[in-house]
Amino acid sequence: MYLTDAKGKEYIDASGGAAVSCLGHGDSDVIKAIQVQADKLAFAHTGFLSSEPAEQLADLLVEKAPSQFGKVFYVSGGSEAVESALKLARQYHLENGEPQRRHIIARQQSFHGNTLGVLAAGGNQWRRKQFEPLLIEVSHISPCFAYR
């Protein structure tokens, strides 16, 4: 698949957007599935409501997951997913009587999203710099390097 810039130059799309667009571009099966679902119910906020596709996907995810994982929690995207994971880790340690376990370690050069919580965990200083007064404390370690 090629992407074309404003000057008409074409590029092979080898990144899938921000590394999350894994379904390709213009796939007719995906477009048809979206259209069929939109004709039934375009959206139902899963925090309060449910829908048949949401229930089916939850069942499939639970079925494929290791046995200790029996629940699904839907969020709107990657930033919210990482933010929720940080909050879940905090809740876990609080409920286990370990409130002192609050430190987060993340990798330099990493990207976890755009909310304040995950921006703090992100490893790109230039993304964080102007927001540092608002961010939680996170330690950053070296990124993976397979050739060292």
Task: Enumerate the predicted regions with their spans.
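Glycine-rich loop-to-alpha-helix module at the N-terminal edge of alpha/beta enzyme cores
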Residues: 10-98, 105
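Active-site and channel-lining beta-strand-loop segments
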Residues: 1-13
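Short beta-strand-to-turn element immediately C-terminal to the catalytic PLP-Schiff-base lysine
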Residues: 4-5, 23-24, 118-122
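Residues in well-ordered beta-strands of folded domains
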Residues: 4, 105, 142
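Sequence-level motif detector for i,i+2 pairs with an aromatic at +2
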Residues: 9, 102, 135-138
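PLP-dependent aminotransferase-class I/II
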Residues: 108-148
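Active-site metal-binding loops of divalent metal-dependent hydrolases
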Residues: 1, 79, 109
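A short helix-loop
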Residues: 101-103, 110
